Regions:
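Glycine-rich beta-strand-to-loop/alpha-helix junction loops that act as flexible
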Residues: 9, 63-65, 86-88
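ATP/NTP phosphate-donor binding region
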Residues: 1-60, 70, 105-108, 183, ...
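Short Gly/Thr/Asp-enriched flexible loops that form oxyanion-binding sites at enzyme active sites
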Residues: 68-81
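Short conserved active-site loop signatures built around small residues
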Residues: 66, 191
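Gly/Ser/Thr-rich active-site loops/lids in small-molecule metabolic enzymes
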Residues: 152-160, 204-227
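ATP/nucleoside-binding phosphotransfer catalytic cores, i.e., glycine-rich phosphate-binding loops
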Residues: 16, 183, 187, 210, ...
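Glycine-rich phosphate/pyrophosphate-binding beta-alpha loops
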Residues: 137, 141, 192-206, 269
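Catalytic core of DAGKc-family lipid kinases
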Residues: 6, 29, 78-82, 86-189
Length: 288
C-alpha cells in the first residue's frame, strides 16, 4: 500500500530526531512513506489533492496534533485513505481517544494494521463547511480558542488557553443563544458538540460519545455566570459522580446553531454562527 506521512514541524513535540526515529522504525517493517512537511492547512490541502487522485487506497500517517489531523480529513475525499495518527502535537486528544499511548505505540499499531471505521462531524457555515473529528465548541469555548495568540500556543502550549480563558472571564459575555435539535430547542451560554468522549486532553466529558459510531451529543451549559464554569471545571478535574444541574445533554444527528457566537472545531477557531452540524458516517478507516 502506498504510504504518505504528514509531519508538522511546528507541532509541540516535533523534532528532527523524533521524525528520523519514526522513519527508521517504519522502514524496519518495509513501510517507506513519502514525507510531506506541512505548516498550514493550505499546504495540507494541496498534498491531499495528490492523494485524492491515487487510483488505489493509500495509508496516510499524520505525525502532528489534533489540528493537523483535522486539516488532513478536511482535505481528503471520504474513503480515499486509511488513516493513522502519531502524537506529535501540543494536544493529542484523538490519540488518547483511540488508545495510542505514545509515538512508539502508534508505530506498533501501524505495523499490526488493525482498523476501525471512523465517523466525523460536519459543521456548515453560511459560505463554507468543515469536518471535525473530536468536537465543536460554540459560545465561551469558541471565544477562548478564537482569542489564543498563535505565539502563545507555540511556546505556552496549554497555558495559552488558560490565559485566553482568563481574558474572557474578565470581559464576561453573559448573553445566551439557542440550539435546535429534533428533540427540541435549548437555550444555552455555551455548547460542546461531542463526536468523542474526551475534551481538552484526558478529561472525559461524554463517556458515551465515540468517533467509531455515527451520532453526536450536545453538552449545553445552561447557566451564564462565571461560577457555573468553575463548578464544571471542578467536575472535569475530579471526575463527576453526579449530575451537574448546569449541564443539559441531548443526543442528535443534526443540530442547528442560532445566533452569532464564536465557533471552534478540534481546537481551531473557524468562524461565527449561525451554523448547522450533522454527521458524516464511516468517513474512513483509522488504525487502532
Amino acid at each position: 500500500m502506498k504510504t504518505f506521512l504528514f509531519v508538522n514541524p511546528a507541532a509541540g513535540h516535533h523534532s528532527a530526531q523524533r521524525l528520523q526515529f519514526v522513519l527508521e522504525r517504519l522502514r524496519q517493517h518495509a513501510i517507506i512513506p513519502e514525507v510531506f512537511q506541512v505548516r498550514t492547512p493550505t499546504e495540507i490541502y494541496s498534498y491531499c489533492d495528490i492523494i485524492n487522485k491515487e487510483h488505489e487506497q493509500c495509508l496516510v500517517i499524520v505525525a502532528g496534533g489534533d489540528g493537523t489531523f483535522n486539516a488532513v480529513v478536511n482535505g481528503l475525499n471520504p474513503g480515499s485513505a486509511t488513516l493513522a495518527v502519531l502524537p506529535f502535537g501540543t494536544s493529542n486528544v484523538l490519540a488518547a481517544e483511540i488508545g495510542i499511548k505514545s509515538i512508539e505505540d502508534g508505530i506498533e499499531k501501524i505495523v499490526v494494521g488493525k482498523t476501525a471505521y471512523m465517523s466525523l462531524g460536519l459543521l456548515e457555515l453560511k459560505d463554507r463547511s468543515h469536518r471535525f473529528v473530536l468536537m465543536a465548541g460554540i459560545g465561551l469555548d469558541g471565544a477562548v480558542v478564537r482569542d489564543v495568540m498563535p505565539l502563545g500556543k507555540r511556546f505556552l502550549r496549554q497555558g495559552a488557553y488558560a490565559l485566553s480563558a482568563l481574558k474572557c472571564a474578565l470581559a464576561w459575555d453573559s448573553s445566551m443563544f439557542e440550539i435546535s435539535t429534533p428533540e427540541g430547542d435549548v437555550t444555552c451560554h455555551s455548547v460542546i458538540i461531542c463526536n468523542a468522549s474526551r475534551y481538552g486532553g484526558n478529561f472525559i466529558l461524554e463517556s458515551q460519545s465515540t468517533p467509531f459510531t455515527a451520532g453526536l451529543t450536545a453538552i449545553c451549559v445552561i447557566g451564564n455566570q462565571r461560577r457555573t464554569y468553575l463548578r464544571i471545571a471542578y467536575d472535569l478535574f475530579s471526575g463527576p459522580k453526579h449530575h451537574n444541574r448546569n449541564l443539559f445533554k441531548v443526543a442528535a444527528s443534526a443540530i442547528e446553531i442560532r445566533g452569532t457566537k464564536a465557533i471552534q472545531i478540534d481546537g481551531d477557531f473557524v468562524g461565527h454562527g449561525p451554523a448547522r452540524i450533522s454527521t458524516e458516517p464511516d468517513f474512513s478507516q483509522i488504525i487502532v
